[in-house]
Amino acid sequence: MLSSGQIRGARAILRLGQAELAEAADISLETVKRIESMEGELKIRLDTLTKIKTALERAGIEFIAENGGGAGVRLRKV
């Protein structure tokens, strides 16, 4: 499961604005803003989360699972 911090971090790495992420994920800008403002577990539809994750991964992001050190995000090595 992704966190709002991972989504914000991924956007920062890519230098991607909220509107650009919304367009890439085919969701509304208001949805991106709402999700990024959430604390704790994201309470959103699975298809919305999948759209965001897929858009960011296509742009080169790799999500890091929480393995004792905390969840994270990084640019995928090519």
Predicted feature locations:
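A detector for short, charged/polar N-terminal pre-domain segments
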Residues: M1-L2
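Short basic helix-loop element that most often maps to the first helix and adjoining turn
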Residues: I7-E20
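Residues in the recognition helix of alpha-helical DNA-binding motifs
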Residues: A10, A24, I35
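Short, composition-biased local secondary-structure segments
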Residues: Q18-S28
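Recognition helix of helix-turn-helix/homeodomain-like DNA-binding domains
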Residues: I27-I44
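DNA major-groove recognition helix of helix-turn-helix/homeodomain DNA-binding modules
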Residues: E39, L46-F63
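Helix-turn-helix/homeodomain-like alpha-helical modules used for DNA recognition
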Residues: I61-V78
